[in-house]
């Protein structure tokens, strides 16, 4: 495959054109009065969105050099989304401004390496400043962060705040599409495993077709049980104690399952059995989680424990257990809080060391189940187009809220970046040469871009707003909704510090890379050939008729031998 190779300023200008095309489409969505973008879909109705990352991912340009520039901005947006969950439009606007100013200076003769160094030093200083000014988030502020990120939707803010309150910051909150028109919150308390009862004969509530136990013993084992002799000692001990029993095992089959069903039917013992969740090593880890949560032990031959050795103290206790045909939910107080915390810390360490997105997701689920619950926000809307847009907004709001809990909050609406620009002047005195100072100035000017864009999108002159905000106190900024200058923290217009930090770091990183690019190598697109002449083509096919002569080489010819 042939390649196109471009050098020097020409290569950088090609990248800039692609960057500007994508960034201009993304920036119009910024702020509470941001405009919508309509995306054509190959199949189905067009999608109307107000979400920067969705717009960015959907753009592919015809010119391969420009498309490479667009991909760089997609990378900025995606990286910011991965780290902080929100702030993709802010990162895009910052990167576009830094690249534009930087390329002007490089074209005028500035040393791109020194300029890049100046950008990196300035961004590093500003990141420390953001961490210094961030305030911890609590109470009402959680709902306010979610409301701002959801485009001013107070109902979404309240729902996310309620979900975080119920499942804690370690819990899992998921967003799903609902078949109804309303948006609702469902919270599952305790640990839920995706395994239901092994036999419908275990059901205790015939109307709801569920098994309900209270203060039941839980036998947890990684063994496959097929002989009833393995279970007899356990069943006798539980029956004498007058308690219900839940058995979680790799599998229970044949004689063992049949005997449990008969005992349940005769009223000898209130019992139910479910298969262990997961597979392989993950299954053992999840069984150990259940054991720690319920205050029991995992009965495994690997640690020298067999079913004959089990007594009541080795079993867990479930304060409330509910089992349907698909899921088992255990609410337990049996485990000590200290042991559960240790287990969560251990899983969190594994989470930090893992490179696999799938493994990370499963480890996060395990933390949530140990921490106390899963909340599901079911999103409803009148049309599919509105539903998709609303779901994207809620996901953004949820990610922003998690980021705020992690690293705290700062005044929103681009205000923090404006006030931080004064720190750049202080830094310039410590920089080694004039070209590094140019890098610092590039960042300082870029810090104005987010507020400028938010104001422009709301129909007011951005440059006027920027100058006015620059002269106010740190927490005072421009409220686009009311058109007033006020204390944004008091007004509930907040940004997660992690979002602002990640947007700035990723924008600075990509700007430095573009400025120091001296050559771009891309694949040369294949020219689409002209449509073939149908008459000529068909005539050629006619020649295939000669193949009919091959018949003469067949069996009759062989007869001549």
Swiss-Prot record:
EC number annotated for this UniProt entry: 5.6.1.7
Family matches, as CDD domains: GroEL
Function (record text): Together with its co-chaperonin GroES, plays an essential role in assisting protein folding. The GroEL-GroES system forms a nano-cage that allows encapsulation of the non-native substrate proteins and provides a physical environment optimized to promote and accelerate protein folding.
Catalytic activity as recorded in UniProt: ATP + H2O + a folded polypeptide = ADP + phosphate + an unfolded polypeptide
GO CC annotation: cytoplasm
Protein family membership: Belongs to the chaperonin (HSP60) family.
GO biological process per UniProt: protein refolding
Cross-referenced Pfam families: Cpn60_TCP1
Keywords tagged on the record: ATP-binding, Chaperone, Cytoplasm, Isomerase, Nucleotide-binding
Major location category of this protein: cytoplasm
UniProt name for this protein: Chaperonin GroEL 1
Positions contributing to ATP binding: 29-32, 86-90, 413, 495
Assembly behavior: Forms a cylinder of 14 subunits composed of two heptameric rings stacked back-to-back. Interacts with the co-chaperonin GroES.
GO molecular function, one term: ATP-dependent protein folding chaperone
Enzyme class, UniProt record, top EC level: isomerase
Subcellular location: Cytoplasm
The species this protein was found in: Trichodesmium erythraeum (strain IMS101)
């Amino acid at each position: 495959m042939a390649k196109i190779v471009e050098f020097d300023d020409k290569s950088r200008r090609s990248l800039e054109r692609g960057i500007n095309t994508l960034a201009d489409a993304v920036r119009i969505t910024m702020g509470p009065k941001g405009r919508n973008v309509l995306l054509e879909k190959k199949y189905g109705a067009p999608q109307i969105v107000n979400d920067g990352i969705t717009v960015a991912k959907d753009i592919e340009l015809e010119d391969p050099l420009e498309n490479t520039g667009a991909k760089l901005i997609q990378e900025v947006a995606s990286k910011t989304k991965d780290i902080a969950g929100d702030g993709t439009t802010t990162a895009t606007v910052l990167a576009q401004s830094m690249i534009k100013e930087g390329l002007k200076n490089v074209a005028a003769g500035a040393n791109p390496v020194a300029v890049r160094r100046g950008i990196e030093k300035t961004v590093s200083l500003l990141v420390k400043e953001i961490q210094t000014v961030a305030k911890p988030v609590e109470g009402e502020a959680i709902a306010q962060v979610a409301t701002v990120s959801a485009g001013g939707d107070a109902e979404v803010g309240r729902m996310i705040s309620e979900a975080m309150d119920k499942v804690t910051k370690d819990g899992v909150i998921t967003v799903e599409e609902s078949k109804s028109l309303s948006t609702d919150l469902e919270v599952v308390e305790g640990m839920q495993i995706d395994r239901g009862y092994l036999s419908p004969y275990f059901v205790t509530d015939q109307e709801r077709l569920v098994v309900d136990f209270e203060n039941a013993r839980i036998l947890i084992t990684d063994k496959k049980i097929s002989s009833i002799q393995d279970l007899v000692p356990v069943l006798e001990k539980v029956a004498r104690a007058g308690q219900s029993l839940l058995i979680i095992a790799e599998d229970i089959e044949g004689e063992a399952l049949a005997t449990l069903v008969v005992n349940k039917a005769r009223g000898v013992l209130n019992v139910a059995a479910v298969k262990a969740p997961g597979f392989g090593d993950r299954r053992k880890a999840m069984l150990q989680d259940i054991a720690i949560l319920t205050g029991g032990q995992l009965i495994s031959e690997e640690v020298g424990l067999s079913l004959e050795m089990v007594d009541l103290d080795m079993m867990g206790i479930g304060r409330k257990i509910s089992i349907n045909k698909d899921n088992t939910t255990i609410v337990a107080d049996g485990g000590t809080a200290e042991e559960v915390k240790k287990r969560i810390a251990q899983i969190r360490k594994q989470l930090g060391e893992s490179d696999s997105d799938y493994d990370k997701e499963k480890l996060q689920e395990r933390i949530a189940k140990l921490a106390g619950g899963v909340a599901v926000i079911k999103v409803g809307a009148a049309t599919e187009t509105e539903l998709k847009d609303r779901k994207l907004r809620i996901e953004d709001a949820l990610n922003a809220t998690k980021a705020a809990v992690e690293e705290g909050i700062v005044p929103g609406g681009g205000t923090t970046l404006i006030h931080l620009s004064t720190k750049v002047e202080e830094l310039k005195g410590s920089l080694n040469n004039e070209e590094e100072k140019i890098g610092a100035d590039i960042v300082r000017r870029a810090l104005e871009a987010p507020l400028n864009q938010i104001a422009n999108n709301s129909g007011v002159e951005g440059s006027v707003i920027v100058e006015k905000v620059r002269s106010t106190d740190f927490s005072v900024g421009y409220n686009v909704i009311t058109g007033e200058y006020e204390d944004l923290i008091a007004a509930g217009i907040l940004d997660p510090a992690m979002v602002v930090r990640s947007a700035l770091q990723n924008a600075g990183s990509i700007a430095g890379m573009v400025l120091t690019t001296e050559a771009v190598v891309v694949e040369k697109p294949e020219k689409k050939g002209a449509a073939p002449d149908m008459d000529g083509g068909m005539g050629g096919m006619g020649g295939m008729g000669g193949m009919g002569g091959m018949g003469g080489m067949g069996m009759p010819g062989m007869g001549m031998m």
